[in-house]
Amino acid sequence: EVEIIENPSFLNSKEDLKVYFQDKKHYHQTDFYKQQRISRNILLENGKPVGGKWTFDTENRKKYPKNKKSPSISFPQNNRFYEEAKVYVSENFGNHYGELTDYQIYPTTISEAEIWLENFLENRFLEFGIYEDSIVEQEHFLHHSVLSPLMNIGFLTPNYIIEKSIEFAQKNEIPLNSLEGFIRQILGWREFIRGIYLYKGSFERTRNFWNHQRKIPKSFYDGTTGIAPIDKTIKKILKTGYAHHIERL
């Protein structure tokens, strides 16, 4: 007998998601996000959204000032896991796309992940909101948390991150547009897209809406398309494996 255990890396179980996704023809992320806020009593006052509206997205689209210095990030020290992985990747995938750096970028343990979260809250959370849509050519992370890989591999749970961020915001006067914008990425978008994956994933993966026939050219893998914004983003990904949501768009 096979027992399927729910994934703790998401807030909603498959059964939870049925409430919104099953038997619907159209899905709207904002509606889903509201339902999640209400059902979990997150950022609510007397059943209504804190600040008078559900999203502060229109306030979070500022251009990054030309002379503004981006916040510092404390990267983990190289540990034995990283050193072992470096050797393995070099020996087995040396010809693959991507750059194998001498220094460790991302956490590889739970304790490192917790430090990474604290570093975000203390150094980047304050202005996350207004600059979350900003793109700067030579900057990889800006004010973003880069917590998605840590949730995806199970180092940190979304519930833990949400609780910590709300607690920190209340104690440190974090602007509501930063707090709400950050919560929305996890509670809104991440959970919503998982629902789409579970209920429409097979359908979407087996269709070719635009009737594409040609293979993706090599230039889209090495960043030589001649289209500057695309090439710069691809090269960032080759270096760090990461691009924030606006760069991906």
Feature roles, as predicted:
Residues 1-105:
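Beta-rich, aromatic/charged-enriched effector core domains that present basic-aromatic interfaces
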Residues 60-245, 249:
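Catalytic cores of enzymes that engage adenine nucleotides and/or redox cofactors via long glycine-rich
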